[in-house]
Amino acid sequence: MIFQDKTVIITGGSEGVGAATARMFAVAGANLLLVARGKKKLEAIAEELRDKTRVEIFAMDVSDAEASVNLFKKADYEFGRVDILINNAGYHKRAPFDLAAIDELATTIDVNLRAPIVLTRLAIPHIMEAGGGAIINVGSLAGRTMVPGSTAYAASKAGLRSLTYSLAEELRGSNIKIGIVSPGPIDTGFIMDDIDAVTDLVFSQPLCTAEDVAQVVLDLCGNNVREQCMHTSSRIFTTVTYLFPRLGRTLRPLFEKKGRRVKKRLIAERKKAEREKTAK
């Protein structure tokens, strides 16, 4: 797909995968409407990119349905069209399910699943009016397999994956591409700032960068792939554990052992970097 002069809405667009995706779309010539809760971070990334393309921001909680309606009104006012929606905003409060706060569980579902459903519903007529485009969801390997300690998050990402496949079938023959990227652990604050609470199993899978995921997002906009897992080994792992859960439970201790080694190394590297930064 040629992105020049297309209008792209990116939720969670102020940092991490969202910011990396915004940078790549900007280089490709797309106009950007970046969405996040924090206005200061939005302003910072917008200022960074305005020498490359036109960028507008909209500070909002994606789980606010009324604000979502206003988001598309702003898109109409500023750009007169919407071509691409990237549902990237995510929320994850790690805790054993039986100890998780009820409001945290609700927020997880609201941000990770209900918001993309509402935003997608609002985006479709705009994208059709623009002549076609894409809706790409940022999922997770957690939506493809069992991840104890992240039950609500995994459920929300499984729902997002189901939304992707069901809607793609419903819109078959239309000019809107529906896709999802399912990465494993990503080297961003979403995981690394809470690394001690992240289950060992997560780190048994290859670590991605925000730029890795962003490139897949752009690729999915224009190819015929419905879902891109990152990486091939993770696709095999999640498929096997989903189809054969008893085998998955048997293999899990081996993967957790591997994950503990990786996690220990990452924590050590992080502490070393912090010491070096302090020394300067």
Predicted regions and their residues:
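Conserved glycine-rich Rossmann-like NAD(P)H-binding loop of the short-chain dehydrogenase/reductase
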Residues: A28-I45
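Residue(s) in the substrate-gating loop at a strand-loop-helix junction
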Residues: S140
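The beta1-alpha1 cofactor-binding region of Rossmann-like NAD(H)/NADP(H)-dependent oxidoreductases
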Residues: K40, F58-N70, I102
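Active-site helix of classical SDR
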Residues: T120, S156
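Conserved glycine-rich cofactor-binding loop
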Residues: T7, S14-G16
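SDR active-site lid
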Residues: E169-S234
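Substrate-binding pocket helix/loop in short-chain dehydrogenase/reductase
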Residues: P96-F97, A101-I109
